[in-house]
Regions:
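N- or domain-start disorder-to-order transition segments that initiate the globular core
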Residues: 1-53
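Catalytic alpha/beta core domains of metabolic enzymes, predominantly
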Residues: 190-336
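Hydrophobic faces of well-ordered beta-strands that scaffold small-molecule active sites
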Residues: 20-26, 45-52, 69-73, 136-142, ...
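C-terminal extensions of enzymes
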Residues: 329-403
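Active-site beta->alpha loop and helix N-cap motifs at the rims of alpha/beta catalytic domains
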Residues: 65-68, 75-176, 180
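Active-site-adjacent beta->alpha loops and helix N-cap segments on the catalytic face
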Residues: 147-153, 171-185, 198-209, 325-326
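Generic structural signal for well-ordered alpha-helices
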Residues: 10, 113-125, 154-158, 181, ...
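An N-terminal structural lobe/cap that precedes and organizes the functional/catalytic core
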Residues: 37-45, 54-87
């Protein structure tokens, strides 16, 4: 007899607000591989329950009722496809080289990446069509190495959007990126603002979308396949931006719980402003953690618990979902989106300039976004993973040339 609940953690989260959405934060191509990996950890009745849950998460034959309503991906996440299905993609890349003998490694990487996006998009087309274009989008990111190159981002966006009607273009939260988002919105192209961590970024994005929509409506552009989401990379703000270190620099000790509260405060405020000002963009929560550790040793996932009830997209990577399944089945949710941050915590956080810049609408100007510590660190990580994809295809290119 198992104590595992029939409804999964994520299904119970959506019960609090059915308008919220769960997205898969990886390529759909590897979903079945991941399912098998998770099921290996379980046995008996527990395994059967989780198997049913995962069938409800992604079920192309019952797309309207499946849990996953969309997908986020990028070159970094697409590297997982090469790693998990290595031999298949080696053969695929070899085929690309045969068809394009003059292609270089950068061109080869881009063509392989587009193929991964295209195949993932096809897997969500049934949902896209049956939902009348409300759901079923797959976010495809422009190359993270060109986040300050407006022309290059626009060029890549135009290529990516041609792959499938349900492709949503992921654009970084730089000054140039927001200019691109405005242009894409004016053309009726769905966008996802990524590499974004702080309220000033979210507001610049929301206003860029608003201005782009005004142009689109003036020009009678078809907006039936348009959506806008604004990503908040929650734990990356605190961890990769080193909020604790920024506090120590001025003599303030911040606990892991304080850091989580900081991240929650930012997204709660963004959610409230978008709602009050009736912006059409929807906040997307990502980079969530099983955290903080509690005194009674119970598992906490504040990034979900403390914002439950909000009208969010929660995009969840395989590793995070696996942790929820294996370690967090007792988690329960209540509507906490309108509950305030503990005043003592907020007072302490507001003494730290790194947090104040993130929490105030005018805490940073657009020219400063590209230098934000979390932007710099995350862009570097994504770029390194992109180089991983390039190295993968480069190895195949060199092997072909040596034969």
């Amino acid at each position: 007899m198992t104590n595992r609940k029939e409804k999964s953690v994520l299904e119970r989260l959506i019960d609090v607000n059915p308008e919220a959405e769960i997205w898969w934060d990886s390529s759909p191509i590897i979903y079945n591989d991941w399912v098998q990996e998770v099921l290996k950890e379980l046995s008996g009745e527990e395994k059967e329950i989780v198997q049913r849950q995962l069938k409800r998460y992604y079920s192309p034959e019952n797309s309207q009722n499946m849990l996953f309503k969309g997908v986020t991906t990028n070159p970094s996440l697409s590297m997982d496809v090469f790693e998990i299905q290595k031999s298949y993609w080696e053969n695929f890349v070899d085929g690309l080289i045969d068809k394009n003998p003059e292609i270089d490694k950068e061109g080869l990487f881009w063509e392989a990446y587009k193929e991964i996006v295209k195949r993932g998009a096809q897997m969500y087309m049934p949902l896209f069509e049956k939902s009348n274009y409300k759901n079923g989008y797959i976010s495809a990111q422009v190359d993270p190495r060109c986040m300050d190159d407006k022309k290059k981002m626009l060029q890549q966006a135009e290529e990516l959007v041609k792959l499938s009607p349900n492709v949503m273009i992921k654009i970084p939260g730089t000054k140039q990126g927001y200019e691109v988002i405005k242009i894409l919105t004016s053309k009726g192209i769905a966008t996802n603002n990524t590499l974004s961590f702080v309220l000033p970024q979210f507001m610049v994005c929301a206003n860029a979308v608003k201005e782009g929509l005004e142009i689109a409506k003036k020009n009678k552009v078809d907006l039936s396949k348009w959506r806008s989401v604004i990503t908040d990379m929650m734990a990356r703000y605190g961890d990769m931006g080193d909020l604790q270190g920024k506090g120590r620099e001025i003599g303030i000790e911040l606990s892991e719980a304080d850091v989580r509260w900081a991240e929650i405060a930012i997204i709660k405020k963004a959610h409230q402003i978008l709602k009050e000002q009736k912006h059409p963009s929807k906040m997307l929560a990502c980079s969530m953690r099983v955290s903080p550790p509690l005194d009674d040793k119970k598992v906490a996932v504040w990034h979900l618990e403390k914002i439950a009830g909000g009208n969010f997209v929660y995009t969840c990577p395989p590793k995070f979902i696996k942790a929820l399944i294996l370690d967090c089945d007792d988690l329960e949710f209540s509507n906490q989106i309108d509950e305030e941050i503990p005043k003592k915590v907020l007072v302490k956080l507001l003494k730290v300039p790194y947090f104040t810049q993130a929490y105030l609408e005018d805490g940073l100007i657009a020219d400063e976004f590209i230098y934000h510590p979390a932007v710099v660190a995350t862009a570097k990580e994504f770029s390194n993973r992109t180089f991983g994809m390039i190295n993968f295809v480069s190895t195949r290119l060199e092997k072909k040339k040596s034969n």
